[in-house]
Amino acid sequence: EVIEEDGTKRFVYLLDETLELDHVGLISTNMAELLVKGITELSYRECATKVSEMTGQTISAMGVWNVIQALGEKVYNEEATLTEEYKKGHVKGEKEVPVLFEEADGVYIKLQGKDRKKEKQDKAEIKIGIAYDGWRKTGPERYALENKVVVAGFSKAKEFQEYREAVIAQEFNLDEVSQRILNAEGASWIKKVKDKSTCFQLDPFHRNKAVKEKIHERTAREAVLELLREEEIEEVFRY
């Protein structure tokens, strides 16, 4: 039993306190981590069964859902705090670079159980953002991004862009960035960036997809794609 400064009492497990273990309700951090890893690949019911077998601690599908919701709420509050600190000008990274490369995309994933009912749909878009200041070759046809920052979330466009900016600002001093290049597929939410000087660039996959959708004549389509592959941009316009 522990008595807090305000006089309230709480009970703790001394070993967990010594090891600085946190809890989500009655669930230990270790078990919560197993649930998070499991739920990315399994249904709530399958995750509950798998984790119960692995740990010897019984948890129901509803129990898994409750833990994920609690963790989600905690993450949401942390993200909101970071965003507010950024808006106040309190977030400024140490890395100073002249050019910042960015990517953004949306991926639809299927929802489960209560999540499906809550959203009144069977899938939702998770927005993804990446920022980095360069790349290096790691092998034949393989490259690794330098100082990569990754952001993901289900929030609306405005909220996501504000949080994305805050996360990037933790790593980079955005006041010192002269040019920001955003490589994306052209969705409307992607264009709602905070820095209006951002240069938008359609990535090769979505560029080629747009050509195939807009140019129906096969010969003309293949000719344009070939010119693009050869980076003959002026020839594309003349064609």
Segments (PLM) and residue ranges:
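Catalytic center-proximal scaffold of phosphoryl-transfer enzymes
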Residues: 3-239
